[in-house]
Amino acid sequence: MTGKSVKDVDRYQAVLANLLLEEDNKFCADCQSKGPRWASWNIGVFICIRCAGIHRNLGVHISRVKSVNLDQWTQEQIQCMQEMGNGKANRLYEAYLPETFRRPQIDHAVEGFIRDKYEKKKYMDRSLDINAFRKEKDNKWKRGSEPAPEKKMEPVVFEKVKMPQKKEDPQLPRKTSPKSKAPVVDLLGLDAPVSCSIANGKTSNTLEKDLDLLASVSSPSSSVSRKVVGSMPTPGSAGSVPENLNLFPEPGSKSEETSKKQLSKDSILSLYGSQTPQMPTQAMFMAPAQMAYPTAYPSFPGVTPPNSLMGSMMPPPVGMVAQPGASGMVAPMAMPAGYMGGMQASMMGVPNGMMTTQQASYMAGMAAMPQTMYGVQPAQQLQWNLTQMTQQMAGMNFCGTNGMLSYGQSMNGGNGQAANQTLSPQMWK
């Protein structure tokens, strides 16, 4: 190879490299794959290696394939490639290709498409002469390609022209913005009421009427609330209920009783309503209708219980048992004569036969009874004289410092003697 031929090869390679830089030549003319490195120089198209194998199978009379880098090119071959190219060749061989046609990707389908395109010339415009198309239309395609960039530049110019129009658009709402504020103020009605109130005094009158209506509506509610408060018992009246139950009222309570009489009917009813939870405490001072001996001693008759308040507070005689159904009451029970002596010895832990605090714990607040009371016959009827008992109880000391029976105080001094003297058999009738 001479030096002249080496220079020609380098020059041809440079021409092919420039042709591959064109946008249409960057993709295969048949399958549109990227980066074709082969060419069919008699047709004038750049193709991929897969399509190059199919072109070889078509035959040399249809397609002649060369490698861009591996084969040597001649001036005639380079001239054919310059005259056609992928874009111009597809306009000739794909003139009647449907717009919705999708290029195949499978080898078998690609081979069928290539044979239809170049061998059968199925999509080719047969009215055109290929040689005339290469020479004559070569300049036309170049001229057609030259104004194309000018048309592309035109929209850029129009965009520059439209830019000032876009600037004017935001100025329109700025001018109309102060006009739009006026109806907003009218809708709120901030200005109109002020002028009307200054011109005419009717607005203030209407407001006063509205306030009067509100006051008239609120007045019945206040009266109802006053009635409800009046009907409810006051804390003073509620707190005075336990004072009515006091057994030993103080002299100052008389003035309170006179003030209580002046209460209305509603307050009296409320007092009775608040007194209902304390009814069980009154039952402790009530006596049953009759206390009978148990069935084990049918020979002894029943004994009528005391009707006075002090009867329930006094300790029962020996042989009395609790009767079911009567709260806080006991019934007498006959005991043998021999049992009485042991009863006195076991139950009486203090002089004069007084009961100990442990044995009389359920009888808290009860008065001490003399020993002679335990000798009463079971068949006798027990009757208490209310007037005598109240006088005697006034002189007795029931409670000590700790709230329990003060046996020491009652046994010492004249109190103990008075108790033994006052509670004499004269009481029993």
UniProtKB/Swiss-Prot annotation:
<feature type="modified residue" description="Phosphoserine">
    <location>
        <position position="223"/>
    </location>
</feature>
<keyword id="KW-0479">Metal-binding</keyword>
<dbReference type="InterPro" id="IPR037278">
    <property type="entry name" value="ARFGAP/RecO"/>
</dbReference>
<keyword id="KW-0863">Zinc-finger</keyword>
<protein>
    <recommendedName>
        <fullName>Stromal membrane-associated protein 2</fullName>
    </recommendedName>
</protein>
<feature type="compositionally biased region" description="Low complexity">
    <location>
        <begin position="217"/>
        <end position="231"/>
    </location>
</feature>
<comment type="subunit">
    <text>Interacts with ARF1. Interacts with PICALM and clathrin heavy chains.</text>
</comment>
<dbReference type="GO" id="GO:0005737">
    <property type="term" value="C:cytoplasm"/>
</dbReference>
<feature type="region of interest" description="Disordered">
    <location>
        <begin position="138"/>
        <end position="181"/>
    </location>
</feature>
<feature type="modified residue" description="Phosphoserine">
    <location>
        <position position="219"/>
    </location>
</feature>
<dbReference type="GO" id="GO:0005096">
    <property type="term" value="F:GTPase activator activity"/>
</dbReference>
<feature type="modified residue" description="Phosphoserine">
    <location>
        <position position="225"/>
    </location>
</feature>
<dbReference type="Pfam" id="PF01412">
    <property type="entry name" value="ArfGap"/>
</dbReference>
<feature type="modified residue" description="Phosphoserine">
    <location>
        <position position="231"/>
    </location>
</feature>
<feature type="region of interest" description="Interaction with PICALM">
    <location>
        <begin position="340"/>
        <end position="429"/>
    </location>
</feature>
<keyword id="KW-0343">GTPase activation</keyword>
<dbReference type="GO" id="GO:0008270">
    <property type="term" value="F:zinc ion binding"/>
</dbReference>
<feature type="domain" description="Arf-GAP">
    <location>
        <begin position="13"/>
        <end position="137"/>
    </location>
</feature>
<feature type="compositionally biased region" description="Basic and acidic residues">
    <location>
        <begin position="253"/>
        <end position="263"/>
    </location>
</feature>
<dbReference type="InterPro" id="IPR051718">
    <property type="entry name" value="ARF_GTPase-activating"/>
</dbReference>
<feature type="region of interest" description="Disordered">
    <location>
        <begin position="217"/>
        <end position="263"/>
    </location>
</feature>
<comment type="function">
    <text>GTPase activating protein that acts on ARF1. Can also activate ARF6 (in vitro). May play a role in clathrin-dependent retrograde transport from early endosomes to the trans-Golgi network.</text>
</comment>
<keyword id="KW-0963">Cytoplasm</keyword>
<feature type="compositionally biased region" description="Basic and acidic residues">
    <location>
        <begin position="138"/>
        <end position="172"/>
    </location>
</feature>
<feature type="modified residue" description="Phosphoserine">
    <location>
        <position position="127"/>
    </location>
</feature>
<feature type="modified residue" description="Phosphoserine">
    <location>
        <position position="240"/>
    </location>
</feature>
<keyword id="KW-0862">Zinc</keyword>
<feature type="zinc finger region" description="C4-type">
    <location>
        <begin position="28"/>
        <end position="51"/>
    </location>
</feature>
<feature type="region of interest" description="Interaction with clathrin heavy chains">
    <location>
        <begin position="163"/>
        <end position="232"/>
    </location>
</feature>
<keyword id="KW-0597">Phosphoprotein</keyword>
<dbReference type="InterPro" id="IPR001164">
    <property type="entry name" value="ArfGAP_dom"/>
</dbReference>
<dbReference type="InterPro" id="IPR038508">
    <property type="entry name" value="ArfGAP_dom_sf"/>
</dbReference>
